[in-house]
Amino acid sequence: MDLLADEGLVDIVPNKGAFVVNPTEDEVLQAYVLRKDLEIMAAGLAMERLTEADFLEMSNSVAEEREALFNKDLSTYLKANQSFHMIFVRKCGNKFLIEFIEKLINQTSIYLMLFDIFFEDSSPKPYGYKEHLEIIALFKQQNLNELEMCLTKHFDHAVGSLDVRNEYKELGSIFGG
């Protein structure tokens, strides 16, 4: 539990227990803005290093993501989404950038678990996997300007899908325990 607290994923409240982090709306926005900026930087560095095998791996992640959305399988969705982003991030060649982005992806995945409305019956159809296909196409075209705009739009949509509530959630309510 201390490891989760060190990673910023849970708050430990003495004599009460462990609770999933309870970020403010501003903290959530800060995490997404930083992640967007760092991923745009990584995308620029990775663009000429990506191979057809990478594009195939990214496409496979998109297929998994789409199926997980259809099946409302949040765990598989989060893994596929992280996989998609980390494929190009790892190609940037900057160890520190990779580590920072991976930490931010883990943090924003918690925010998705807490606040995303994709999996509610009334939510609109998800668009993220379609944007991922567009991102792959722009990498293949090596069109950095369009890719930066697409990534910005992608992160704006991600933030727009969140419903930030200011309340603690017990771990069991999220992890099924």
Regions found by a protein language model. Name each.
Residues L34-R49, S83-D121:
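Hydrophobic, amphipathic alpha-helical faces that serve as interaction scaffolds
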Residues M47-R66, F70:
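Hydrophobic, well-structured mid-protein blocks that either form specific transmembrane helices
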Residues I40, S61-V62, N71, S83, ...:
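C-terminal all-alpha effector/ligand-binding and dimerization domain
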Residues E65-H85, V89:
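Exposed, interaction-prone assembly regions rather than primary DNA-binding/catalytic cores
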Residues M1-E48, D54, F96, V159, ...:
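Short linear motifs at protein or domain termini
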